[in-house]
Protein backbone atom coordinates (compact mmCIF):
# COMPACT_ATOMS: atom_id res chain seq x y z
CA UNK A 1 0.00 0.00 0.00
CA UNK A 2 1.18 3.51 -0.83
CA UNK A 3 0.15 6.36 1.46
CA UNK A 4 1.81 8.98 -0.76
CA UNK A 5 -0.55 11.61 -2.15
CA UNK A 6 -1.38 11.70 -5.84
CA UNK A 7 -0.82 14.86 -7.87
CA UNK A 8 -4.52 15.75 -7.60
CA UNK A 9 -4.50 15.22 -3.84
CA UNK A 10 -1.39 17.36 -3.46
CA UNK A 11 -3.13 20.09 -5.43
CA UNK A 12 -6.07 19.99 -3.03
CA UNK A 13 -3.63 20.25 -0.13
CA UNK A 14 -1.71 23.14 -1.74
CA UNK A 15 -4.90 25.02 -2.61
CA UNK A 16 -6.34 24.64 0.88
CA UNK A 17 -3.11 25.66 2.60
CA UNK A 18 -2.65 28.68 0.33
CA UNK A 19 -6.24 29.82 0.86
CA UNK A 20 -6.02 29.49 4.62
CA UNK A 21 -2.53 31.05 4.75
CA UNK A 22 -3.83 34.07 2.85
CA UNK A 23 -6.62 34.49 5.37
CA UNK A 24 -4.10 34.08 8.20
CA UNK A 25 -2.00 36.91 6.77
CA UNK A 26 -5.14 39.02 6.73
CA UNK A 27 -5.83 38.45 10.42
CA UNK A 28 -4.51 35.17 11.73
CA UNK A 29 -5.58 34.18 15.20
CA UNK A 30 -6.67 37.79 15.80
CA UNK A 31 -9.45 37.20 13.30
CA UNK A 32 -10.19 33.88 14.99
CA UNK A 33 -10.51 35.67 18.31
CA UNK A 34 -12.94 38.17 16.79
CA UNK A 35 -15.20 35.42 15.45
CA UNK A 36 -15.02 33.54 18.75
CA UNK A 37 -15.91 36.58 20.83
CA UNK A 38 -18.75 37.51 18.47
CA UNK A 39 -19.92 33.87 18.43
CA UNK A 40 -20.31 33.87 14.68
CA UNK A 41 -18.67 31.78 11.94
CA UNK A 42 -16.37 33.14 9.25
CA UNK A 43 -18.99 33.49 6.53
CA UNK A 44 -16.48 34.65 3.93
CA UNK A 45 -14.41 31.50 4.37
CA UNK A 46 -17.58 29.40 4.21
CA UNK A 47 -18.46 31.11 0.93
CA UNK A 48 -15.03 30.34 -0.51
CA UNK A 49 -15.29 26.67 0.45
CA UNK A 50 -18.74 26.54 -1.14
CA UNK A 51 -17.37 27.93 -4.38
CA UNK A 52 -14.65 25.27 -4.38
CA UNK A 53 -17.24 22.55 -3.80
CA UNK A 54 -15.38 21.24 -0.78
CA UNK A 55 -18.42 20.67 1.42
CA UNK A 56 -19.24 17.77 -0.88
CA UNK A 57 -15.72 16.62 -1.69
CA UNK A 58 -16.36 13.02 -0.57
CA UNK A 59 -20.03 12.80 -1.62
CA UNK A 60 -21.13 11.11 -4.86
CA UNK A 61 -21.62 13.36 -7.86
CA UNK A 62 -25.28 12.39 -8.18
CA UNK A 63 -25.90 14.20 -4.88
CA UNK A 64 -23.96 17.30 -5.91
CA UNK A 65 -20.62 16.21 -4.52
CA UNK A 66 -17.23 15.86 -6.18
CA UNK A 67 -17.19 12.07 -6.01
CA UNK A 68 -13.78 11.83 -4.36
CA UNK A 69 -13.08 9.92 -1.15
CA UNK A 70 -12.10 9.84 2.49
CA UNK A 71 -8.45 10.57 1.67
CA UNK A 72 -9.36 13.87 0.02
CA UNK A 73 -11.72 14.75 2.87
CA UNK A 74 -8.96 13.88 5.34
CA UNK A 75 -6.59 16.28 3.57
CA UNK A 76 -9.10 19.12 3.88
CA UNK A 77 -9.91 18.39 7.52
CA UNK A 78 -6.22 18.41 8.40
CA UNK A 79 -5.67 21.78 6.73
CA UNK A 80 -8.76 23.28 8.37
CA UNK A 81 -7.56 21.90 11.71
CA UNK A 82 -4.19 23.59 11.22
CA UNK A 83 -5.92 26.93 10.76
CA UNK A 84 -8.63 26.35 13.40
CA UNK A 85 -11.14 27.53 10.80
CA UNK A 86 -14.11 29.05 12.67
CA UNK A 87 -16.73 27.45 10.43
CA UNK A 88 -19.01 24.41 10.84
CA UNK A 89 -17.18 22.42 8.14
CA UNK A 90 -16.44 19.39 10.30
CA UNK A 91 -19.95 19.12 11.81
CA UNK A 92 -21.49 19.39 8.35
CA UNK A 93 -19.31 16.73 6.74
CA UNK A 94 -19.83 14.42 9.72
CA UNK A 95 -23.59 14.66 9.28
CA UNK A 96 -23.47 14.28 5.50
CA UNK A 97 -21.21 11.24 5.87
CA UNK A 98 -23.71 9.57 8.19
CA UNK A 99 -26.61 10.37 5.86
CA UNK A 100 -24.71 9.06 2.84
CA UNK A 101 -23.94 5.72 4.45
CA UNK A 102 -26.97 5.18 6.68
CA UNK A 103 -29.71 6.97 4.76
CA UNK A 104 -32.11 5.50 2.24
CA UNK A 105 -31.94 6.44 -1.44
CA UNK A 106 -34.82 8.87 -0.91
CA UNK A 107 -33.18 10.46 2.13
CA UNK A 108 -29.88 10.88 0.30
CA UNK A 109 -31.57 12.42 -2.74
CA UNK A 110 -33.45 14.90 -0.55
CA UNK A 111 -30.91 15.79 2.14
CA UNK A 112 -27.44 15.61 0.62
CA UNK A 113 -27.52 18.15 -2.26
CA UNK A 114 -27.98 21.25 -0.02
CA UNK A 115 -25.26 19.95 2.31
CA UNK A 116 -22.88 19.21 -0.57
CA UNK A 117 -23.34 22.74 -1.93
CA UNK A 118 -22.97 24.39 1.47
CA UNK A 119 -26.41 25.93 1.13
CA UNK A 120 -27.21 24.30 4.45
CA UNK A 121 -25.12 23.34 7.44
CA UNK A 122 -25.59 20.28 9.60
CA UNK A 123 -24.45 18.84 12.90
CA UNK A 124 -24.30 15.58 14.84
CA UNK A 125 -25.33 15.06 18.45
CA UNK A 126 -25.57 12.19 20.92
CA UNK A 127 -28.85 11.94 22.80
CA UNK A 128 -29.00 11.14 26.50
CA UNK A 129 -32.29 11.28 28.37
CA UNK A 130 -33.97 12.99 25.44
CA UNK A 131 -31.43 15.72 24.73
CA UNK A 132 -28.01 16.24 23.20
CA UNK A 133 -26.09 18.43 25.62
CA UNK A 134 -23.22 19.54 23.37
CA UNK A 135 -23.75 19.70 19.61
CA UNK A 136 -20.85 21.37 17.81
CA UNK A 137 -22.10 23.57 14.97
CA UNK A 138 -25.63 23.28 16.31
CA UNK A 139 -26.13 27.03 16.22
CA UNK A 140 -25.90 27.15 12.41
CA UNK A 141 -27.32 23.71 11.58
CA UNK A 142 -30.31 23.32 9.30
CA UNK A 143 -30.21 19.54 9.61
CA UNK A 144 -29.34 17.42 12.64
CA UNK A 145 -28.32 13.79 12.93
CA UNK A 146 -28.95 12.53 16.45
CA UNK A 147 -27.45 9.28 17.75
CA UNK A 148 -28.96 7.17 20.50
CA UNK A 149 -28.50 3.54 21.53
CA UNK A 150 -26.86 2.47 18.28
CA UNK A 151 -29.44 4.15 16.07
CA UNK A 152 -29.56 7.47 14.24
CA UNK A 153 -32.31 9.75 13.13
CA UNK A 154 -32.23 12.84 10.98
CA UNK A 155 -34.47 15.84 11.41
CA UNK A 156 -34.67 19.52 10.48
CA UNK A 157 -33.55 22.03 13.07
CA UNK A 158 -37.12 23.37 13.15
CA UNK A 159 -38.24 20.20 14.91
CA UNK A 160 -35.87 20.78 17.81
CA UNK A 161 -35.34 23.23 20.63
CA UNK A 162 -31.82 24.65 20.23
CA UNK A 163 -30.10 26.60 22.99
CA UNK A 164 -26.60 27.99 22.52
CA UNK A 165 -24.24 27.00 25.32
CA UNK A 166 -20.74 27.99 26.39
CA UNK A 167 -17.97 25.65 25.32
CA UNK A 168 -14.25 25.33 26.01
CA UNK A 169 -13.61 25.92 22.28
CA UNK A 170 -15.47 29.09 21.28
CA UNK A 171 -14.29 29.00 17.65
CA UNK A 172 -17.40 27.04 16.66
CA UNK A 173 -20.90 27.30 18.05
CA UNK A 174 -22.12 24.75 20.58
CA UNK A 175 -25.73 24.06 21.40
CA UNK A 176 -27.97 21.92 23.54
CA UNK A 177 -30.53 20.24 21.29
CA UNK A 178 -33.83 18.75 22.43
CA UNK A 179 -35.85 17.12 19.63
CA UNK A 180 -39.63 17.20 19.62
CA UNK A 181 -41.13 13.91 20.72
CA UNK A 182 -41.29 11.47 17.82
CA UNK A 183 -39.55 13.90 15.45
CA UNK A 184 -37.17 12.77 12.74
CA UNK A 185 -36.60 9.85 10.42
CA UNK A 186 -34.51 6.80 11.20
CA UNK A 187 -31.33 6.22 9.21
CA UNK A 188 -31.46 2.47 8.72
CA UNK A 189 -28.49 1.82 6.44
CA UNK A 190 -24.79 1.30 7.20
CA UNK A 191 -24.50 3.45 10.32
CA UNK A 192 -21.28 1.77 11.57
CA UNK A 193 -19.57 2.49 8.24
CA UNK A 194 -20.64 6.11 8.41
CA UNK A 195 -19.46 6.49 11.99
CA UNK A 196 -16.05 5.01 11.17
CA UNK A 197 -15.57 7.50 8.34
CA UNK A 198 -16.67 10.29 10.68
CA UNK A 199 -13.99 9.22 13.16
CA UNK A 200 -11.37 9.46 10.42
CA UNK A 201 -12.47 13.03 9.61
CA UNK A 202 -12.21 14.06 13.26
CA UNK A 203 -8.80 12.40 13.59
CA UNK A 204 -7.63 14.30 10.51
CA UNK A 205 -8.56 17.64 12.05
CA UNK A 206 -6.69 16.64 15.21
CA UNK A 207 -3.59 15.85 13.16
CA UNK A 208 -3.80 19.37 11.75
CA UNK A 209 -3.94 20.77 15.28
CA UNK A 210 -0.83 18.75 16.19
CA UNK A 211 1.04 19.96 13.14
CA UNK A 212 0.29 23.64 13.76
CA UNK A 213 1.15 23.42 17.46
CA UNK A 214 4.49 21.83 16.62
CA UNK A 215 5.22 24.41 13.91
CA UNK A 216 4.49 27.37 16.19
CA UNK A 217 6.48 25.88 19.05
CA UNK A 218 9.60 25.14 17.01
CA UNK A 219 9.53 28.67 15.59
CA UNK A 220 9.16 30.16 19.08
CA UNK A 221 11.95 28.18 20.79
CA UNK A 222 14.33 29.07 17.96
CA UNK A 223 13.73 32.79 18.49
CA UNK A 224 13.19 33.07 22.26
CA UNK A 225 16.48 33.53 24.09
CA UNK A 226 17.48 33.04 27.70
CA UNK A 227 21.02 33.62 28.96
CA UNK A 228 21.96 34.66 25.43
CA UNK A 229 20.99 31.43 23.65
CA UNK A 230 17.75 30.14 22.08
CA UNK A 231 15.70 28.16 24.59
CA UNK A 232 15.41 25.42 21.98
CA UNK A 233 19.09 24.64 22.48
CA UNK A 234 18.38 23.30 25.98
CA UNK A 235 17.87 19.55 26.05
CA UNK A 236 14.70 19.72 28.13
CA UNK A 237 13.06 21.85 25.44
CA UNK A 238 14.49 20.07 22.41
CA UNK A 239 13.50 16.67 23.82
CA UNK A 240 9.95 17.94 24.34
CA UNK A 241 9.80 19.15 20.73
CA UNK A 242 11.11 15.79 19.54
CA UNK A 243 8.36 14.01 21.46
CA UNK A 244 5.79 16.37 19.94
CA UNK A 245 7.05 15.39 16.49
CA UNK A 246 6.84 11.67 17.32
CA UNK A 247 3.28 12.06 18.62
CA UNK A 248 2.24 14.04 15.55
CA UNK A 249 3.68 11.56 13.08
CA UNK A 250 2.21 8.58 14.92
CA UNK A 251 -1.24 10.15 14.70
CA UNK A 252 -0.69 11.13 11.06
CA UNK A 253 0.31 7.59 10.08
CA UNK A 254 -2.67 6.00 11.83
CA UNK A 255 -5.06 8.50 10.27
CA UNK A 256 -3.61 8.12 6.77
CA UNK A 257 -4.02 4.36 7.05
CA UNK A 258 -7.64 4.73 8.18
CA UNK A 259 -8.47 7.13 5.34
CA UNK A 260 -6.88 4.70 2.87
CA UNK A 261 -8.88 1.81 4.35
CA UNK A 262 -12.14 3.76 4.06
CA UNK A 263 -11.60 4.08 0.31
CA UNK A 264 -9.67 0.93 -0.61
CA UNK A 265 -10.32 -1.79 1.99
CA UNK A 266 -13.46 -1.16 4.09
CA UNK A 267 -13.08 -4.46 5.95
CA UNK A 268 -10.05 -2.96 7.72
CA UNK A 269 -11.82 0.29 8.49
CA UNK A 270 -13.41 -0.44 11.91
CA UNK A 271 -10.07 -1.21 13.56
CA UNK A 272 -8.22 1.46 11.59
CA UNK A 273 -10.75 4.18 12.48
CA UNK A 274 -10.67 3.33 16.19
CA UNK A 275 -6.87 3.31 16.15
CA UNK A 276 -6.71 6.65 14.31
CA UNK A 277 -9.17 8.42 16.60
CA UNK A 278 -7.47 7.10 19.75
CA UNK A 279 -3.99 8.05 18.53
CA UNK A 280 -4.96 11.48 17.22
CA UNK A 281 -7.03 12.35 20.30
CA UNK A 282 -4.15 11.67 22.69
CA UNK A 283 -1.55 13.23 20.43
CA UNK A 284 -3.41 16.50 19.90
CA UNK A 285 -4.06 17.06 23.59
CA UNK A 286 -0.47 16.16 24.55
CA UNK A 287 1.17 18.14 21.74
CA UNK A 288 -0.89 21.29 22.28
CA UNK A 289 -0.33 21.10 26.06
CA UNK A 290 3.41 20.74 25.47
CA UNK A 291 3.24 23.72 23.12
CA UNK A 292 1.79 25.87 25.90
CA UNK A 293 4.55 24.78 28.29
CA UNK A 294 7.29 25.39 25.72
CA UNK A 295 6.03 28.95 25.32
CA UNK A 296 6.75 29.56 29.00
CA UNK A 297 4.81 32.10 31.03
CA UNK A 298 3.28 33.78 27.99
CA UNK A 299 1.84 30.47 26.81
CA UNK A 300 -0.74 30.52 29.59
CA UNK A 301 -2.12 33.97 28.75
CA UNK A 302 -5.28 34.84 26.83
CA UNK A 303 -3.25 37.11 24.53
CA UNK A 304 -1.10 34.22 23.33
CA UNK A 305 -2.49 32.23 20.42
CA UNK A 306 -1.40 28.75 21.41
CA UNK A 307 -4.32 28.09 23.77
CA UNK A 308 -6.77 28.01 20.85
CA UNK A 309 -5.12 24.80 19.65
CA UNK A 310 -5.37 23.18 23.07
CA UNK A 311 -9.05 24.02 23.34
CA UNK A 312 -9.83 22.64 19.90
CA UNK A 313 -7.93 19.45 20.72
CA UNK A 314 -9.87 18.87 23.93
CA UNK A 315 -13.20 19.21 22.17
CA UNK A 316 -12.38 17.18 19.06
CA UNK A 317 -10.80 14.45 21.18
CA UNK A 318 -14.15 13.90 22.91
CA UNK A 319 -16.29 13.87 19.75
CA UNK A 320 -17.88 10.46 19.09
CA UNK A 321 -15.77 8.91 21.83
CA UNK A 322 -12.31 9.66 23.17
CA UNK A 323 -9.15 7.58 23.23
CA UNK A 324 -10.24 5.29 26.08
CA UNK A 325 -13.50 4.40 24.36
CA UNK A 326 -11.79 3.83 21.01
CA UNK A 327 -9.18 1.55 22.57
CA UNK A 328 -11.91 -0.49 24.27
CA UNK A 329 -13.64 -0.83 20.92
CA UNK A 330 -10.38 -1.79 19.23
CA UNK A 331 -9.77 -4.48 21.84
CA UNK A 332 -13.25 -5.89 21.22
CA UNK A 333 -12.58 -6.01 17.46
CA UNK A 334 -9.33 -7.96 17.76
Where are these regions (language model features)?
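Short, flexible active-site-proximal loops enriched in glycine and acidic residues
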Residues: 83-92
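Charged, low-complexity surface segments at secondary-structure and domain boundaries
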Residues: 1-4, 95, 183-184
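Alpha-helical interface subdomain recognition
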Residues: 1-83, 106, 118, 196-334
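Generic beta-strand or strand-like secondary-structure segments
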Residues: 75, 79, 94-98, 110
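Structured catalytic cores of enzymes that bind and process phosphorylated ligands/cofactors
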Residues: 9-11, 92-97, 101, 114, ...
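FAD-binding core of flavoproteins
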Residues: 85, 97, 105-219, 229
Amino acid sequence: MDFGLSDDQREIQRTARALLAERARAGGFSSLREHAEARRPDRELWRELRELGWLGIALPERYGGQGLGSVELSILCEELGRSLAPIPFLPTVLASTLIEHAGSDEQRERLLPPLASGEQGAAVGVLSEGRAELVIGGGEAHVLVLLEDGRARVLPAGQTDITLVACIDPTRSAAEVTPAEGAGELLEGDLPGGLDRALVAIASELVGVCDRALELTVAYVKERKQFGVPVGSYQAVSHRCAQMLLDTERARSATAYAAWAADADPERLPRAAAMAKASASEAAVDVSASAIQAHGGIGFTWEADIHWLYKRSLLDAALLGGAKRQRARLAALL
